[in-house]
Amino acid sequence: MAEQSMGPRDFFRKEAAIADLALLACPGAEELCNLVDGHLVRWAREIGMDVDTFIIPSDCPRFQSGDAKGLVKASTRGDDIYIFVDPGNYSVTYNLFGYENHLSPDDHFQNLIRLIQAVSGRAHRISVIMPSLYGGRQHRRVSRESLDCAYALQQLRAMGVKNIITFDAHDPRVMNAVPLMSFDNVMPTYQVLKCLLHHVPDVNFSKEHFLVVSPDEGAKIGRAHV
């Protein structure tokens, strides 16, 4: 079978397009969204498209009471939307009653829900790009405990999300909670090794000088590909 390759012209081909592309970034995921947008804009300009950005401005402002709302600042009607959210980004803060609070994974997920609410019913399709899978370490029940990740995926499906894209899920079998929804688990093994070789050029991968440490039993499968 011949190797299939897709170039910018194929990616933005009108007859193959589902709808106009749009990107949304939850608080804390702006950097990743901007990087993706930069590649998309460059590809679009290579084929003569006059576009400055695919990002639709959005925000999740908070009231003095601590409540928040999702705000999308442009029309998304009929768009193919990709929403970026990073539940593991603890550097995002907000002030509440004189105290600086850091966003927890629960806060990040709730911001995602707010933005989905803001565009649902208008967008052609909604996909979520979540580098760190929300609740990914609570994927199975061994005692009287919650199943946060499975229920979160079911909640997103119920809200109209068609596709989840995540990286190196703790246990990708959690996709069984939503068998009819697309779930893409991308393994970043190549990118990790590429970055390692770039920053540590004298690294030695021989068995006498190199050791891979797995943080827990569930991570051994992912590390085996290294």
Identify what each model region corresponds to.
Residues 1-225:
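PRPP-associated nucleotide enzymes
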